[in-house]
């Protein structure tokens, strides 16, 4: 309650709203099209709705990388659930969704976030996906390439190319599985 009162008292002095807490306030529910609010997150966001500023939430806890745009008509809210620097504890290099063990670096210019980048301990090019040949073949005997995408966002455009040519969507299949490395 004291923290909520502090937010109410200090809201007139802010130019950018970044809320950092341990557990995610919102998450994608695999069976739903919108995130499920947790606890009293909406009550806290209501403190800032008259500011007309975008709200950024930083969270962790789940050992996954996830970005959620919170569906509110009165304000713009994005929550970034960060992967964990220790991975999934028992398997250091990776988190539960296959995201690398990492921390996230944010760059600011004034009140604007100019860049968000994962800093991991393996491949610096491995920002949002890992591509590898799983050794499997399809029904026609052609090799199958597996791709794990983490921290995806519904506004992203996903395009797969083979030797420079776009692969038809009919040849792509989305699956919810653990990363092969995990």
For the regions a protein language model found, what residue spans apply to each?
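Active-site-proximal beta-strand elements of phosphoester/diester hydrolases
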Residues: 1, 18-22, 77-83
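Short, small-residue-biased leader/transition segments that mark boundaries at the very start
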Residues: 3-8
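Active-site-proximal segments of metal-dependent phosphoesterases and phosphodiesterases across multiple
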Residues: 12-59, 67-72
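Flexible, glycine-rich phosphate/dinucleotide-binding loops
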Residues: 26-27, 88, 167
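Outer-membrane beta-barrel proteins
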Residues: 30, 125-127, 171
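Substrate-binding cleft of secreted/luminal carbohydrate-active enzymes
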Residues: 62-67, 101-105
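Binuclear metal-dependent phosphoesterase catalytic core
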Residues: 72, 76-163
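Solvent-exposed serine/threonine-rich low-complexity stretches and specific carbohydrate-binding patches
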Residues: 166-182
